[in-house]
């Protein structure tokens, strides 16, 4: 029987073709170098997702023009083949349009989840298959554990970098094909490896902004793609009294305190956004407390239904904590009862399910928050 290589495939590394998704950042560049140094046949692929402009070209964003050049420089240094796929139309249809629709519906979207689901793990997945690759390798900070031809996803050991929340919409077929070499590393360890390998991106800052949203200015992006799609409306208190006027619901998100446009002797927060009435409802912090969440469009990636008999946890925002919960699933919907109070839960965000076992916190799946 052929021994498994370092990424769990029964082939000699030199006979194993891996596609590395190279964004031009330190993580994916380090992964490409690790694969090359271990003797794998490596092709790096970088996605061009949007047309750069003076407004969107930023060092804080991923997949910008400079990032593509950085990825190519790393590939050249490693002497690996490098391809650029031009996915601007796919990205607009699968990510930007969804982002705009969600904001206009009074939600707070997560375009990175949609990007992973559509462009990266669907279109890039298909390209890797077309090239007869054995695996698609990325620089995400998540762990994957394979037993008996079944792969499960776990939180990365670097909890400050863990990206499992953004990957809950992965399918089982995709997960079985994906590899995450950084899941057992801390970010500082990744940078140290990059320095040891003399990669030019070793100290490159991490991307922070949403790639197509310059400086966090959502309104300008929506105005660009959907001119005149939002308008002024009323701001009301919890008693239904009009206390101000807003310039468009897209400028607000649940839990927001600053920049609301109204003041009171006590702090006010955005409690609810009613899109069909073009209204913003504000209230005190206690009005943001929730213990019940309704979800839609579930995606379950565990094959073991016994996982749901374990102690369960959920995460309701990318930077949030794990909260103990009970989960009642009904087809593609779910009701989640939080065993601890949480503030500022926003429709449009994801609620991701975890179960703790001997390997860590296993990702069971998740869904989109309706209310």
Curated annotation (Swiss-Prot):
Alphabetical GO CC annotations of the entry are: cytoplasm
Q: Which keywords does the record carry?
A: ATP-binding, Cytoplasm, Disulfide bond, Nucleotide-binding, RNA-binding, Transferase, tRNA processing, tRNA-binding
Q: Spell out the protein name for this chain.
A: tRNA-specific 2-thiouridylase MnmA
Q: What is its EC number?
A: 2.8.1.13
Major localization class? cytoplasm
Location(s) in or outside the cell: Cytoplasm
Q: Which residues form a coiled coil?
A: none
Binding of ATP, residues? 21-28, 47, 139
Report any Pfam family annotated for this entry.
Answer: tRNA_Me_trans_C
Q: Which pairs of positions does the record mark as disulfide bonds?
A: 115-211
Q: Which reaction does it catalyse?
A: S-sulfanyl-L-cysteinyl-[protein] + uridine(34) in tRNA + AH2 + ATP = 2-thiouridine(34) in tRNA + L-cysteinyl-[protein] + A + AMP + diphosphate + H(+)
Which species?
A: Pelagibacter ubique (strain HTCC1062)
- InterPro entries cross-referenced by the UniProt entry: MnmA-like, MnmA-like_C, MnmA-like_central, MnmA-like_central_sf, Rossmann-like_a/b/a_fold
Task: Please provide the Gene Ontology terms (biological process) for this protein.
Answer: tRNA wobble position uridine thiolation
């Amino acid at each position: 029987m052929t021994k498994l290589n370092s990424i769990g495939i029964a082939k000699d590394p030199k006979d194993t073709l891996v596609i590395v998704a190279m964004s031009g950042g330190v993580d994916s560049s380090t992964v490409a170098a690790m694969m090359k140094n271990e003797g794998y046949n490596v092709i790096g692929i970088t996605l061009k997702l949007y047309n750069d402009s003076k407004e969107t070209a930023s060092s804080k964003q991923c997949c910008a023009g400079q990032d593509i050049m950085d990825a190519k420089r790393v590939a050249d240094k490693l002497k690996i083949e490098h391809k650029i796929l031009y996915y601007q139309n796919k990205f607009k249809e699968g990510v930007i349009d969804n982002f705009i629709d969600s904001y206009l519906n009074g939600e707070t979207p997560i375009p990175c989840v949609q990007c992973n689901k559509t462009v990266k793990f669907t279109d890039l997945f298909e390209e890797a298959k077309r090239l007869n690759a054995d695996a698609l390798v990325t620089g995400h900070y998540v762990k994957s554990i394979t037993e008996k031809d079944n792969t499960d996803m776990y939180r990365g050991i670097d909890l400050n970098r863990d990206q499992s929340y953004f990957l809950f919409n992965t399918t089982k077929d995709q997960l079985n094909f994906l590899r995450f070499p950084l899941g057992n590393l801390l970010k500082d360890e990744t940078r140290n490896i990059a320095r040891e390998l003399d990669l030019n991106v070793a100290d490159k800052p991490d991307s922070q902004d949403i790639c197509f949203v310059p400086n966090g200015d959502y309104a300008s992006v929506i105005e660009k793609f959907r001119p005149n799609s939002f308008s002024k409306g009323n701001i009301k208190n919890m008693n239904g009294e009009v206390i101000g006027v807003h310039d468009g619901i897209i400028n607000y998100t649940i839990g927001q305190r600053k920049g609301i446009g109204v003041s009171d002797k006590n702090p006010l927060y955005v409690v609810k956004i009613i899109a069909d009435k073009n209204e913003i409802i504000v209230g005190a912090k206690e009005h943001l407390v929730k213990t019940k969440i309704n979800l839609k469009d579930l995606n379950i990636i565990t094959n073991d239904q016994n996982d749901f008999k374990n102690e369960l946890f959920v995460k309701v925002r990318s930077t949030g904590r794990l909260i103990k919960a009970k989960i009642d699933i009904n087809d593609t919907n779910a009701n989640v009862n939080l065993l601890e109070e949480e503030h500022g839960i926003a429709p449009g965000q994801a609620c991701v399910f975890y179960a703790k076992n001997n390997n860590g916190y296993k990702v069971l799946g998740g869904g989109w928050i309706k209310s």
